[in-house]
């Protein structure tokens, strides 16, 4: 049935209902996940896709880097496993950084949804597993295979029967076998819940197919975004952002072109790929660039294949923003999450009254690893990622947000959760006074955190931070934000990137 045969009001109701379906999918993932970074912080994505791979709806809960790159993952799944070969009860999995969401820690599971024996849609989801073997989270690897288990596109479940061989491989290649396997099951479960709710919706609205609704969603969204772009002045706008990198600074160079009803962003001139694990696969570059554009151009339009269609993103292969296999990519967020601010620097020239100043941009996740007990024969290790944020840039008509993860959108991990799941103690967690750049509206404040072992033992800090040498810049005459830093409370500095030991009795201090 065509969209015109259903009626606009009914289509709009079904669109909103579909968004609620995928939001329940995401909430199921949060409520069943084992890793605190998922269940407490929402480092995930969830969405429903047409049989042709178009994204029809995404959950409100989730990160842009996962959602927009997961949309590409579904297309890869369909190329490997055509829809006509899928059966009810099948599920497919990968953590391939170039076909998934940018690094090995993110597992993507895609599941076909059947109704009355016929495939109706695909549900897909992503979440971050804290430990997947290898060197662990950080920048130290020099190729992707050092960073953990690498799962190609495989069948996780065949007609409802789980692939126990694959699960055994996952368990054996992680320092957290119970948590990792549990997270895989939570991903599969959330897709199943999404399918159940979709079938209920289709029964309620007497739908035999999602084609008409999907066409309406994508066509309506694309037209709305193109109309908004058409209100901006045509032109070519350039911006360069310099950030810390590893060893040498990195230049992120963007040329944004507005031409009638479309926007292209080209990163030609950006620094080459790094020998360390801060490289970014193209899908992740596209995801965060599109998110930055959407925030200014189409913030009130739901995210789907149609709303993304007017944006075209490119970066020369071999640059840090289009790093080919087997480049190390574990900490790709350190670079990729800068890209909305890079695109804002371009858009500020076309729409100066709508664009915020630069913020902390990338997360300041405090990833720690060590023994759970001081006993020398204790073989059980803890691995934890305490999600931590700086502040956002000042907005055109109000201050920036303090201690807020933008652009990732994840929540900070509560201190109580960190101290419950790992033998660490937080002596301090508070706003960092005067850290937001001054101006008519100031930037959001960062944080001060102080952390020590709770059992008098050494532990490792897997550092991957930025904005230390090159702080966030103000806009339109506003002041820069304060630079980040990390050190011991006794004064000795710690490196912004790289695995380091925090000795027993020492307190590590972080200024975001």
Predicted regions and their residues:
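Glycine/proline-enriched, intrinsically flexible loops and inter-domain linkers
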Residues: 1-88, 93-512
